[in-house]
Amino acid sequence: MMPIMPPTRLSPQELINELQSSGVRLVDPRAGVESRRGGAGPSDHKAMTIDGQTVMVPVHTAPAFDSPYLVEAPDAFGRSRVRRGDVVLGEVEFPGRPRFYDLKTDDGVPYSQIAVLHGRDVLATTVLQTCIRYQSRTKTCQFCSIGQSLSAGRTIARKTPEQLGEVAKAAVELDGVTHMVMTTGTPPGKDRGAKILAESVAGVKARVDLPVQVQCEPPDDFAWLQRMKDAGADALGMHLEAVTPEVRRKIMPGKAEVSVDTYFAAFEAAVPIFGRGQVSTYILAGLGDSVDEILSVSRRLVDIGVYPFVVPFVPISGTPLESHPTPSPQFMHAILRPLAGMLVDAGLKSVDVKAGCAKCGACSALSTYEKAEGGCGSRLAAE
């Protein structure tokens, strides 16, 4: 009989980095909250908690199907061991199904078609499930699956402010949700979704005191930034996705029409309105930008008070990039470790963000790298 190899534990940031790059195979796919397929945001993932940090880990992607990492079925205490062959690398737990998913609006729309739980305590919604970019093959972002969940009947095309307020109130009261992410497909018009978001966040704030991040492309008129803030938005995300013009034109030809320079002008206008660290941008590592290019742009962002939320690219089934390789854990480590140092040195820490993707941190190991760099204390709590 061969001896069982002793456990070899990875640090939390190492384990999260490995699993998010390679995905996992599940012995019991029914464990925890049902995983998402399609839609905006983290899709084809499953929420798992590692060392107190809830993260999104790919389970339905091509790399995940061949992943060397296996998550065992939960034991009697709800813990599952993560193995690579005979080696135990760590443990995960699965957040439970939220209670607000059992409710419907008066007109019969399930709450889960209006907003969903991300991570452990974050409510997320795509206010407008259609997008001018997605509807054109020559303009679509090749990584995006915003239309998939709509086509499958898992969501509705337009969420009203009243619906969003109703669901947000229930999610806070029943499941202890602590903040909300509100994104949108880009509609026709120069406000690029800011108007819909302002109306929507006002609908939520009328029903419940819940911090909300809004996410859109930079509007042509930066006055919309103040209007969203005045409507109740606590934080703002304007997502570059990729940092170099060449990669942006190749991967997201429609969205690339709004240049990197325009994004930086919008960032500089937004930071005085929302505050340092309350403006963020999502950067997908692994689309073609180099480590140095991502870190160089991140430095520019940090210097003006914008939080660069760098996540590993995860290919989503049914998109043009479904077979695109994921970045290696080594590639992500080469970005996340120095980036975490930049953020901690600048006082831009995820723990201080009021709402949104950077605060949630589930799609990247970045916040755990911050903690390793000594960035676990909250500046806001000390003030």
Predicted regions and their residues:
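Auxiliary Fe-S-binding modules of radical SAM enzymes
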Residues: 1-84, 273, 295-383
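N-terminal [4Fe-4S]-dependent radical SAM core
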Residues: 54-142, 147-156, 354-373, 382
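Short, flexible helix-coil linker/hinge segments at the edges of structured domains or between repeats
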Residues: 138-140, 161, 205
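Glycine-rich anion/phosphate-binding loops
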Residues: 155-166
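Conserved AdoMet/S-adenosylmethionine-binding subsite of the radical SAM
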Residues: 165, 169-174, 179, 183-324, ...
